[in-house]
């Protein structure tokens, strides 16, 4: 990917990049050692002067190190030069971790990029738990990733999840506000505890059945395991969840053979960080609701 723009006033290139392109100082510092900065077609350093009318270009090519490419089938929902959205299956990590360096979505994406001749990085914008499925968004370079970080901070990304739960909220719509606390001892589990971080989830009931319900969930905050914990703590755990469940929800899930947890990132809406266009990406997957054969959230 290459950014191109025209200088409108005098100044140093570094100031131009930070002011006009909103680049972080760390990214500018990294680019200056990669021969990635050009003014009027000439590779220059960050202290190079720019004048009104100068053509400035920034090459944002990246390489990926630290894990190996793997052949795997990927479901690409959307792609352009700045980002890619994949439909992640359940049971797969988004990115390698210290304990697992293979079999992740990123391993397959590395093969995809190399096969298509793309010099892209792998920067997850949205991550999903191993057993949560649906839309995963990844930036192709650090510049776009930083744009998404700022978009997150300003509330410019809307995520919609579908969840089939055991039980149901009394109200048809509402907000769950419960702090999420990370348990100690190296555990990944979270608990509702006053010592935790503020966490807010909006919900809307889409369908109700005798024992279960289909919910649309909108995480206002993005804490680890937030949706799963909030549903369980509110009395309607997600079906198939191996960690955040009640005895009754686990028994019901086992009775109907529900595995993995029925939580799907069905839709992601945002303003494209490069084009400025309203963008909506939808998963092709759906949660399984045993009391309804075709439950969807459009």
At which residue positions do the language-model features occur?
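RNA pseudouridine synthases
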Residues: 1-184, 290
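Short beta-strand micro-motifs in enzyme catalytic cores
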Residues: 84, 161, 213-215, 266
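Well-ordered beta-strand positions
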Residues: 77-78, 129, 181, 204-207, ...
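Short, surface-exposed secondary-structure edge patches
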Residues: 45-49, 216, 260
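Short, P/G- and charge-enriched loop/turn segments at secondary-structure junctions
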Residues: 72-73, 187-193, 252-257
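Pseudouridine synthases involved in rRNA/tRNA modification
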Residues: 1-30, 197-200, 205-212, 220, ...
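Short histidine-centered loop motifs in beta-beta connectors
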Residues: 41-43, 210-217
């Amino acid at each position: 990917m290459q950014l191109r723009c025209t200088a409108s006033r005098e100044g140093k290139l570094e100031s131009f990049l930070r002011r006009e392109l909103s680049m972080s100082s760390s990214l500018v510092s990294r680019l200056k050692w990669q021969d990635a900065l050009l003014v009027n077609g000439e590779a220059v350093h960050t202290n190079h002067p720019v004048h009104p009318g100068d053509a400035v270009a920034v090459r944002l090519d990246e390489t990926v190190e630290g894990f190996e490419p793997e052949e795997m089938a990927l479901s690409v929902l959307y792609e352009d030069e700045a980002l890619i959205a994949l439909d992640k299956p359940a049971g797969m990590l988004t990115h390698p971790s210290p304990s697992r360096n293979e079999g992740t979505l990123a391993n397959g994406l590395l093969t995809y990029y190399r096969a298509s001749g793309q010099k892209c990085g792998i920067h997850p914008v949205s991550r999903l738990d191993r057993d949560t499925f649906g839309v995963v968004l990844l930036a192709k370079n650090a510049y776009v990733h930083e744009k998404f970080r700022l978009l997150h901070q300003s509330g410019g990304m809307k995520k919609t999840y579908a969840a089939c739960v055991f039980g149901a909220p009394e109200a048809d719509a509402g907000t769950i506000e419960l702090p999420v606390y990370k348990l100690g001892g190296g555990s990944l589990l979270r608990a509702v505890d006053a010592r935790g971080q503020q966490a807010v989830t909006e919900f809307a009931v889409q369908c109700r059945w005798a024992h279960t319900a289909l919910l649309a969930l909108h995480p206002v905050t993005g804490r680890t395991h937030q949706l799963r914990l909030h549903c369980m703590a509110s009395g309607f755990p997600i079906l198939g969840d191996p960690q955040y469940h009640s005895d009754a929800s686990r028994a019901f899930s086992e009775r109907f053979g529900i595995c993995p947890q029925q939580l799907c990132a069905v839709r992601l809406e945002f303003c494209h960080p490069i084009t400025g266009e309203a963008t909506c990406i939808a998963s092709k997957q759906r949660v399984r609701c045993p009391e309804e054969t075709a439950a969807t959230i459009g």
